[in-house]
Each structure stands twice: as structure tokens, then as C-alpha cells.
Curated annotation (Swiss-Prot):
It comes from Arabidopsis thaliana. InterPro entries: Kinase-like_dom_sf, LRR_receptor-like_kinase, Prot_kinase_dom. The keyword Signal applies. Belongs to the protein kinase superfamily. Ser/Thr protein kinase family. The protein kinase domain is predicted to be catalytically inactive. One of its GO terms (biological process) is regulation of cell differentiation. This is Inactive leucine-rich repeat receptor-like protein kinase CORYNE. Involved in the perception of CLV3 and CLV3-like (CLE) peptides, that act as extracellular signals regulating meristem maintenance. Modulates root, shoot and flower apical meristem maintenance and floral organ development regulation, probably via CLAVATA (CLV)-like pathways involving at least CLV3 and CLE19. In complex with CLV2, perceives secreted CLV3-like effector proteins from plant-parasitic cyst nematodes as ligand mimics of the plant CLE signaling pathway. This recognition is required for proper feeding structure (syncytium) development and ultimately successful nematode infection.
Length: 401
């Protein structure tokens, strides 16, 4: 990487040297032409005493034209110089597109990554942005790899638009690698090959929340209310960190159960933070977890993340898959939020709760209060939704964590 940066530095210095040489030649010609004009004007002025009135007028016009020409030449030269200097500064500030592994963890080496990627890896799942794999390094470390979809939607690999997306993605990955929170997936390394990126994360043995909830529906896994509430609190604490604790506010843009990973203790970790805004395949992707303002007017704020969280909290409370119709009643509107609101207004909120976790009266009261929080998060108006900071306080009040 150091050698690559040296080559980039050498090419930048060569470019600057050529431009400086151009400036010297250009301005030497400009100064020569200006001095010639001055000599012409001087010669004309010495002969003007013996000139006729007509010749005097011609001489005056020549002098004016020479002065105007000199001023215009100076202005054009200044503009060209300013443009070139700005271009040089912009070029030097550009992030170089790195190739090969970029590692952020001392437990991983570029060599071990290359070797593991070349061998067989186990497919775990996929979404619009790419596929997830399980991979074992030569030191025995188990990691998860997400191979992002190709950047084919932004032109050829060497086009300026493709390079721009790669630079933005690279900057985003470097930003994500610096985030440290127990409820965020830590980026350990990434590899760029041609127009594809492979992201390396810690391996989560319980998979995604989507995987677990599917197993709950088929009765392969039991997930009590205490664990579900812990998952909800962990998700919103991750959002709180992104929204309020980072130097620059970070939005998730694609919060849904497939992007919530669960460790061995069912502690949630948010994955793919911010990547959806960069990947071309996600620009038009809208799911039932997307806030109405993001799908209707392409506006996205921290309150849009809160809407997505409200959908996840609704899934945890009801156990239902929001992509399936909830009931035949027209009053429900066919969406999770409208269905929950309808039951709340009709005094039948208990009917929405997952029957497999109903039992103790105290837990049932907590679930009903959480249902009210869900409905607020799913408001059509962003200003009516609570912030992630407020949600942490609201949810932790339901139970002692």
C-alpha cells in the first residue's frame, strides 16, 4: 500500500511539474507579446507629433486596442491559472482507489484473506446488495464475508462515474471501520477485486433476526419476550450511537431484520450501516420497512430509521411477517402499522401480540406498552416519531436492563 501511495505521489508531482512548465512558457509568451505592444505604442507616440489628425485618431485606436487586449489577456490568464490550480488541488485531495485487502484487525492478514477467499466458502444468505458467506481463516478465526453486488449500474469499471462510486464506497468503509459499539457490526477488513467489494465482519452464530424469526414461526426456536425486548433495546442503542454519538451523524438507510445480526447471547448488531445510499442496486429498492417519505420523495432522515425500527419492533411483538397480508378487513389497510393502529383504536390491541409469548401479566403489560411505542414510530409524519435517544429511555423503562 505504501508503494502504491508513493507511485500516486510521484504521478501527482510529475503532473504539477508539467503544469508549472506550461505556466512559464505561457506567461513568457504573454509578457513578450505585451512588450512588443509597448514598443509599438512607444514608436507610435514618438512619431505622433508629426502625424496628421487622421493618423492621430488611428494611433489612439491602436493604443486603446492594445491596452484592452492586454487587460483581457491578463484576465484570461488569471482565470486559466485559477482553474488549473483548483483542478490540481481537487486531484491531490482525491482518495486513491486501493486494490487488494485493506485490513483493520490484527487477527487478519492479507495473505490469509486471499487464501480463504480462494477456497470454498459457505453461503449464508443474500439480499439486494450482495451475498453473505461463512469463511474460516488459516488461524482458525471464523468470519462472515459479504460480497457486494457489482457496480455495473454506474458504467464501465474505468469510467469516471464508476470510480466516483468506488471512492465514496471506500470512504464509507473506512468510516465504518472506525465505529466501535457493542450493537454495531465491526468491519474487520475489505477486499476490492475489479468492480466488486468483499466486506469482512465478525461471524454471528445466530445469524440474522430474519433467520431467527422465521424459525420462531415454524416453532424451531422459542424466543421469549425478555429476549425480544433485549433485541429491540440493542437495535435502538445502535441507532442512538449512529445518530448522536458520531462526529457526523450517520444514518442506516436500510434497517430491516436481515441487517440485524445476533451473537451467541442474542445481542443484536446492526450491519451495512450507510451502504444502501451508495450501492446503485439500492437507489430504487423500497421494502415494507422503508419510511413513506423515503419511498415517495426520496427524503431520508434519522426519523426514517425510526420508522424502520418501528416495523422491526412490530415484528418482534406480533411474530408476523410484514410482507404477508394480515387480515381481510379493509380497515387494516393491509400494512403492519395500519393493522396495529386499527386494533389499538378498537380496544383489541392484545389480539396483535404473538400468542407464543403471552403468559405472565407483567410481561403482557410491557408488550402492550411497547405496542403503543410501535404505533408512534410508524407515524406517517416524521416529526411525530420519537428520536432514538428518546426511544432508549422509553424502552428501558419497560424492563430492567
Amino acid at each position: 500500500m505504501k508503494q502504491r501511495r508513493r507511485r500516486n505521489g510521484c504521478s501527482s508531482s510529475n503532473t504539477i511539474s508539467l503544469l508549472l512548465l506550461f505556466f512559464l512558457v505561457f506567461f513568457s509568451r504573454t509578457s513578450t507579446s505585451t512588450s512588443c505592444r509597448r514598443r509599438t505604442v512607444k514608436h507610435l507616440s514618438t512619431t505622433s507629433t508629426s502625424s496628421t489628425p487622421l493618423e492621430s485618431r488611428i494611433t489612439s485606436k491602436v493604443i486603446v486596442i492594445s491596452i484592452v487586449s492586454g487587460i483581457l489577456t491578463g484576465l484570461v490568464s488569471a482565470l486559466v491559472l485559477a482553474f488549473l490550480v483548483r483542478s490540481i488541488v481537487k486531484f491531490m485531495k482525491q482518495t486513491p482507489i486501493l486494490k487488494g485487502p485493506v485490513v483493520f484487525s490484527p487477527k487478519i492478514t492479507p495473505k490469509s484473506l486471499h487464501a480463504a477467499l480462494s477456497n470454498g466458502i459457505q453461503l449464508l444468505g443474500s439480499d439486494l446488495n450482495g451475498k453473505y458467506y461463512k469463511m474460516v481463516l488459516d488461524n482458525g478465526l471464523v468470519v462472515a464475508v459479504k460480497r457486494l453486488g457489482s457496480l455495473e449500474g454506474v458504467g464501465s469499471p474505468e469510467s469516471s462515474s464508476s470510480k466516483s462510486v468506488k471512492r465514496r464506497l471506500q470512504k464509507e468503509l473506512e468510516l465504518l471501520a472506525g465505529l466501535r459499539h457493542r450493537n454495531l457490526m465491526s468491519l474487520r477488513a475489505y477486499v476490492r477485486e475489479s468492480d466488486e467489494f468483499s466486506l469482512v465482519y465478525d461471524y454471528m452464530p445466530n445469524g440474522s433476526l430474519e433467520d431467527v424469526m422465521n424459525k420462531v414461526r415454524t416453532k424451531e426456536v422459542e424466543l421469549g419476550w425478555e429476549i425480544r425486548l433485549r433485541v429491540a433495546v440493542g437495535i435502538v442503542k445502535g441507532l442512538q450511537y449512529l445518530h448522536f454519538s458520531c462526529e457526523t451523524q450517520i444514518l442506516h438507510y436500510n434497517l430491516k431484520p436481515t441487517n440485524v445480526m445476533l451473537d451467541s447471547e442474542f445481542e443484536p448488531r446492526l450491519a451495512d450501516c450507510g451502504l444502501a445510499k451508495i450501492m446503485p442496486s439500492s437507489h430504487t429498492a423500497v421494502s415494507c420497512y422503508s419510511a413513506p417519505e423515503s419511498s415517495q420523495s426520496n427524503r431520508y432522515t434519522d426519523k426514517s430509521d425510526i420508522f424502520s425500527f418501528g416495523m422491526i419492533l412490530g415484528v418482534l411483538l406480533t411474530g408476523r411477517d410484514p410482507t404477508h397480508p394480515f387480515c381481510e378487513e379493509s380497515a387494516s389497510g393491509g400494512s403492519l402499522g395500519q393493522w396495529l393502529k386499527h386494533l389499538q383504536q378498537s380496544g383489541e390491541a392484545r389480539e396483535a401480540l404473538d400468542k407464543t409469548i403471552l403468559g405472565e401479566e407483567v410481561e403482557e403489560d410491557e408488550m402492550l406498552m411497547a405496542l403503543r411505542i410501535t404505533i408512534i414510530c410508524l407515524s406517517d409524519f416524521p416529526a411525530d416519531r420519537p428520536s432514538s435517544d428518546e426511544l432508549v429511555h422509553m424502552l428501558t423503562q419497560l424492563h430492567s436492563f
